[in-house]
Amino acid sequence: VFEMMGFTKVAVHRSKKVSLYRQGEINLILNEEPKSHAAYFAAEHGPSACGMAFRVRDAQKAYERALELGAQPVDIPTGPMELRLPAIKGIGGAPLYLIDRFGEGNSIYDIDFVYLDGVDRHPVGAGLKEIDHLTHNVYRGRMAYWAQFYEHLFNFREIRYFDIKGEYTGLTSKAMTAPDGKIRIPLNEESAKGSGQIEEFLMQFNGEGIQHVAFLTDDLIA
């Protein structure tokens, strides 16, 4: 699926069955490691986004501040010569990693992964440039909780609020954004009217989680 969307497998993990797919500024990690957090997450939720990462100025300071403000730590086992990345419990129990190593030659990928010979490390692919936003679907009455989670821990702010009503179903949505505007997370919950697409996702996914990831491109039609 990734390759059909223009992504290229550019690297593999040094010690685990994990692959790095890249296009533009987008990095997608495919984790096929057995008995890993990803494997247990998939067993509970099916194929899904089992984690995400925020770039921060100082990962350790951001992690310690998050814990002081009530975030729950997540301990991910690491192997030899592998970076230990600080992470907190995010939506649906998925780890939210805090990363301060990025840039050519100094990123987590340069340390934990081995680039494939003869493969362009920075493929243009189909023209997808970066992640535009990723959406969380949450239980009715929990949208305010997750909005406060991002506001409290990362100084996000609400930029839009939607109350979409249909004849039989509806949903409400808060669009949250990071202080620099580079991370955008719409939070969706079902309206009190009945069962619709949000409720359907929660049932199929077996809980709250990342419902979709949207990519930015200069030419959507192409």
Could you say what each language-model-derived stretch is?
Residues 1-14, 22-75, 82, 87-161, ...:
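Glyoxalase I/VOC metalloenzyme domain signal
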